[in-house]
Amino acid sequence: MIDTIGMTDIGNGRPSNQDAYLLRQKEKNGKLYLLAVVCDGMGGLKKGEIASHYIVEVLKQWFDETLFDGLETMGIDMIEQNLIDLIRRINQNLLLMSRRMEETKSMGSTLTLLFVEEHEFFVLNVGDSRTYWFDRNRKFVTTDHTLAELELRAGHLTKEQATKDPRR
């Protein structure tokens, strides 16, 4: 097993904690499987905590109840595609939920996810919650999905301008 730990902090001046995380691991057929998820409700939007907790609950259910059915026939690429499809369905469900209730009209959350199968892994992300690879140098594994990042990649902003841009 891999030692994991998680915690959240409401931060300064926030009325609610919109963060949620998930750490799950299991051994099956001599292989270790780990799912680590961080969701950050979008602070400028109402009820981000509903979105972030919903994402975590669906992914927890997937890991605990669905992943290990038929696992013998799946490689890590198929698991990754299954998760991408699930994240798309989660997004569609969040959009439907947000349209049904006034209080959740503009809810949203970022997502960064690490999945490990023994000696292989992949990372998925939505939004600007980052995943880093730490060795002697800190490296980004993910790219922010923000307008400022798009402008930076297109050459319309410098790195310094992008860090100060309100669209980051």
Pin down the residues of each PLM region.
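PP2C/PPM-type serine/threonine phosphatase catalytic domain
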Residues: 1-168
